[in-house]
Amino acid sequence: LPGIAEVMEYLHEIGVKMAVASNGKEEHIRTGLKRKGFEKYIGAIATKEEVENPKPASDVYLLAANKLGVNIENSIAIEDSKPGAIGASKSGATLILQTNDITKHMDFTGVQYAYKDVDLLETIKDVVENK
């Protein structure tokens, strides 16, 4: 996601816990995080391998929040996929939907997002200050 490195650095600086909630395999996620230098920011990884129902269910988000020891209602989910957005929306987290070239033409009707296609860092700052 464009701007995610700046978001992670900002959240890390102010002490916000971060997790990855993914339908991918943990091994692949860890490799990607390490390659991008993001592993130092991530306190937990929750994957479809650990839950009964993967995205678009909310299970992986709930597990990620549980692993971090935080309440899902106080969490922010940043998503760029329809299944992820549906799952995040169902979880009770504040959803920031950032579409990409593939997903920008998809119908997200029924997905309860707080923000869509915004300046990610500025939006995160606003949300964190108001949580």
For every predicted segment, state its role.
Residues 4, 17-18, 36, 60:
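Short, flexible segments with low predicted structural confidence
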Residues 19-20, 97:
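Hydrophobic beta-strand core positions in alpha/beta domains
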Residues 9-12, 25-26, 30-131:
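Asp-based, Mg2+/Mn2+-dependent phosphohydrolase catalytic module
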Residues 1-9, 13-14:
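Metal-dependent phosphoesterase signature
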